[in-house]
């Protein structure tokens, strides 16, 4: 073997050897680093997909629960409105009934007062007529008229 002292050829061989060694060494080293990084990225992607799937399922479940809660709230609101309308109608009926009873009571009181006043006026009119008749009677009734009146009254009593 002869020693090659040509620097161009020597550097070229050295460069090929160094590049070959670097390629062989770095391929294993960088390949391992890149493979670990690739595995970590794939694992993170799988975790993200799993979290996305779980979040989607949770969202779907929450939306269905929300829809059910909204339906229940709507039913409760409708029931409340119906109950309020029923209570309002019952209150109106009760108020009308009480007002009718009060009016009937007032009418009965007014009729009773009117009847009492009529009776009182009749009594007063009868008493006034009796007083007037008693005042006028002695002057108009002489002995023969009195005898006629007594005879007529006796006949009426006998016929009765």
Swiss-Prot record:
It is a single-pass membrane protein. It is found in: Cellular thylakoid membrane. F(1)F(0) ATP synthase produces ATP from ADP in the presence of a proton or sodium gradient. F-type ATPases consist of two structural domains, F(1) containing the extramembraneous catalytic core and F(0) containing the membrane proton channel, linked together by a central stalk and a peripheral stalk. During catalysis, ATP synthesis in the catalytic domain of F(1) is coupled via a rotary mechanism of the central stalk subunits to proton translocation. Component of the F(0) channel, it forms part of the peripheral stalk, linking F(1) to F(0). This is ATP synthase subunit b. The gene is atpF. NCBIfam families: PRK07352.1. Belongs to the ATPase B chain family. PANTHER family: ATP SYNTHASE SUBUNIT B, CHLOROPLASTIC.
């Amino acid at each position: 073997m002869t020693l090659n002292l040509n620097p161009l050829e020597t550097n070229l061989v050295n460069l090929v050897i160094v590049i070959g060694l670097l390629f062989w060494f770095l391929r294993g080293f960088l390949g391992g680093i890149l493979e670990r990084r690739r595995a970590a990225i794939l694992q993170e992607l799988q975790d993200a997909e799993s979290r996305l799937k779980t979040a989607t399922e949770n969202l779907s479940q929450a939306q269905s629960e929300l829809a059910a809660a909204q339906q229940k709230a709507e039913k409760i609101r409708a029931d409340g409105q119906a109950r309020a309308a029923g209570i309002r109608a019952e209150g109106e009926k009760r108020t009308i009934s009480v007002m009718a009873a009060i009016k009937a009571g007032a009418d009965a009181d007014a009729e009773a007062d009117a009847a009492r006043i009529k009776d009182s006026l009749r009594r007063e009119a009868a008493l006034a007529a009796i007083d007037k008749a008693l005042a006028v009677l002695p002057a108009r009734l002489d002995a023969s008229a009195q005898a006629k009146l007594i005879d007529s009254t006796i006949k009426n009593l006998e016929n009765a």
